[in-house]
């Protein structure tokens, strides 16, 4: 009987040399241009001939492009370029899914370089290879056309490397690995049961099988960093020239501050969920409908909303607590202990 495997994401920060940074920037630009060109091809084919272009069609076009224009073949690995085309295909699939469901669709957009997150690779060894050090603490990434790049970080569990994403955020480069890991047997010290509900005033309120109450205070990450974030936002607003170096530096400072808050939120959620998962074999909670909970109160011109500012503030508080993140982490940790998770319907 084969061993059960789960896919996990683990992230390392990359430390390229100045020369490697130039090469990575060029790779990112080539993928951004490919994405936009593929989007333009789909739009043009539909508007001019009513023709729908598929992912397979665009892969065939890419093959011709790489054959006829050597600069495209030299720009990036073929399978990596196919992953960029796949990203666009997923964007269209999500668009049509929302249209079918009667939701606000959001047509796929052209991406500026600053809003293009990165590029991906699939099969390990095809244009890239990651070599971890002992215990998967730090390592090195060999990237075709770039060379060997130092990577720093720590994977919680080793496994078989399946795919990777090279990400550019806040002026920094990251490697996000998809790793197939053995389903861990997380230790559990007790076999209790609990049910909980999430809130804004108190982050978590719950009750155990022994009729004991559980409460976790809301850390209010936004309130902790509010003054600094507003100050950094104002610094960006005072520099209207989007091409100026001063504005770019201000934008990077703001993005770095937000990323720091996100890391603190994630670390806190991991600590809290690990502690709870070690105590309870059965956990029940109410299904979350965050989209409905954070819907804007602005209304329409004909029927304007009421207390719009108050609702916007509440939405910010809801999103700041990240209940979806907490629930996701809590669920998989409970299941890894061999426990049971129950999502109770809201109605």
Task: State where each predicted segment sits.
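Gly/serine-rich nucleotide phosphate-binding loop at the start of the catalytic core
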Residues: 1-83
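Well-ordered beta-strand positions in beta-sheet-rich domains
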Residues: 11-13, 163, 193
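Beta-strand secondary-structure signal
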Residues: 13, 87, 174-176
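Generic detection of short hydrophobic beta-strand segments and adjacent strand-loop junctions
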Residues: 12-14, 148-153, 214-216, 342
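A broad, structural surface signal
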Residues: 22-29, 33-40, 86-93, 97, ...
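Positively charged, helix-rich recognition surfaces that bind polyanionic ligands
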Residues: 3, 9, 22, 79, ...
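Acidic carboxylate diad motif detector
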Residues: 56-169, 299, 310, 316-320
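Short coil/turn segments at secondary-structure boundaries
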Residues: 39-40, 44, 50, 99-111, ...
């Amino acid at each position: 009987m084969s061993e059960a495997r789960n896919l996990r994401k683990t992230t390392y920060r990359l430390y390229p040399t100045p020369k490697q940074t130039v090469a990575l920037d060029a790779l990112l630009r080539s993928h951004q241009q490919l994405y936009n060109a593929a989007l333009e091809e789909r739009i043009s084919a539909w508007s001019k001939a009513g023709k729908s272009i598929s992912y397979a069609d665009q892969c065939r076009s890419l093959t011709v492009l790489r054959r006829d224009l050597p600069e495209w073949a030299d720009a990036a690995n073929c399978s990596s370029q196919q992953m960029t085309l796949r990203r666009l295909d997923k964007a269209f699939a999500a668009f049509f899914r929302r249209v079918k469901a009667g939701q606000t669709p959001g047509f796929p957009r052209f991406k500026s370089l600053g809003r293009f997150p990165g590029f991906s690779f699939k099969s390990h060894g095809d244009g890239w290879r990651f070599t971890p050090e002992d215990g998967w603490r730090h390592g090195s990434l060999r990237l075709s056309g770039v060379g060997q790049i130092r990577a720093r970080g720590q994977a919680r569990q080793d496994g078989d490397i399946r795919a990777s994403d090279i990400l550019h955020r806040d002026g920094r480069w990251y490697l996000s690995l998809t790793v197939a890991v053995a389903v861990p047997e997380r230790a559990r010290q007790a076999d209790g049961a609990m049910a909980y509900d999430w809130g804004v005033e108190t982050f978590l309120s719950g009750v155990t099988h022994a009729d004991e109450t559980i409460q976790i205070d809301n850390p209010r990450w936004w309130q902790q960093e509010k003054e600094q974030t507003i100050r950094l936002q104002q610094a960006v607003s005072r520099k209207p020239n989007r091409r100026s170096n001063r504005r770019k530096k201000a934008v990077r400072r703001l993005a770095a501050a937000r990323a720091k808050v996100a890391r603190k939120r994630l670390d806190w959620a991991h600590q809290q969920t690990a502690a709870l998962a070690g105590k309870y074999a059965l956990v029940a909670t109410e299904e979350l409908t965050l989209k409905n909970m954070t819907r804007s109160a602005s209304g329409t011109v004909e029927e304007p909303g009421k207390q719009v500012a108050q609702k916007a503030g509440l939405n910010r508080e809801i999103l700041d607590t990240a209940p979806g993140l907490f629930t996701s982490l809590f669920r998989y940790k409970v299941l890894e202990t061999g426990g049971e998770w129950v999502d109770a319907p809201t109605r």
